[in-house]
Amino acid sequence: MVTYRGATYPWECDQIGHMNITWYTSKFDQANWNLFAAVGITPSYLREGNFGVAGVQQNITYKRELMAGDVIEVRSRILEIREKVIRFLHEMMTAETQEIAATCEITAVHLDRRTRKSCPFPEAVRNAAEAQVG
């Protein structure tokens, strides 16, 4: 599923002329929230339930440069859902050629913000995520 669409702006580029790694992370983070919303982890769910999601591991692989003016999209999929853990993959690509510029695999834990400890995902979230594993 497409979880982010945007462009590479000149101010996001470094002295070498390509998008700086800071911006890859930022765009992947925006994709996180769209992916979460698709399985029921919405802003209201997080606020009203006093829940959170914390990344515990993030691996980014850079495959090709993105330059100012490149239109990009991120496609995401869930790799695994467990009682308290979700693992997913983002692929950032140029919208024009569909060439993958970077991938980001993240493992995250569901949190109870009151106790500051991990807690199980609700059944509805687990079921929605399981339906999208692929």
Feature locations, PLM:
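Terminal targeting signals and extreme-terminal segments of soluble enzymes
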Residues: 1-73, 79-134
